[in-house]
Amino acid sequence: KTCENLSGTFKGPCIPDGNCNKHCRNNEHLLSGRCRDDFRCWCTNRC
């Protein structure tokens, strides 16, 4: 099972998804990340 949490440390506009995805994996050591409709970075993790 996975769940999404808003990234607490991602800076800047969340376009494109790649920036957010990289941030979640490299900086927060989570599975992945994506930009949602609110233009914020949401990280996916196991929960």
UniProtKB/Swiss-Prot annotation:
Disulfide bonds: 3-47, 14-35, 20-41, 24-43
InterPro entries with a match to the protein in the record: Defensin_plant, Scorpion_toxin-like, Scorpion_toxin-like_sf
The UniProt record lists the keyword Lyase: no
Keywords on record: Antimicrobial, Disulfide bond, Fungicide, Plant defense
A GO BP annotation: killing of cells of another organism
SUPFAM superfamilies given in the database record: Scorpion toxin-like (SSF57095)
Residues annotated as signal peptide: none
Tissue: Epidermis and vascular bundles of pods, stems, roots, leaves and wet or dry seeds.
PROSITE patterns for this protein: GAMMA_THIONIN (PS00940)
Keyword Translocase: no
Family: Belongs to the DEFL family.
Described function: Possesses antifungal activity sensitive to inorganic cations.
Protein known as: Defensin-2
Organism (species): Pisum sativum (Garden pea)
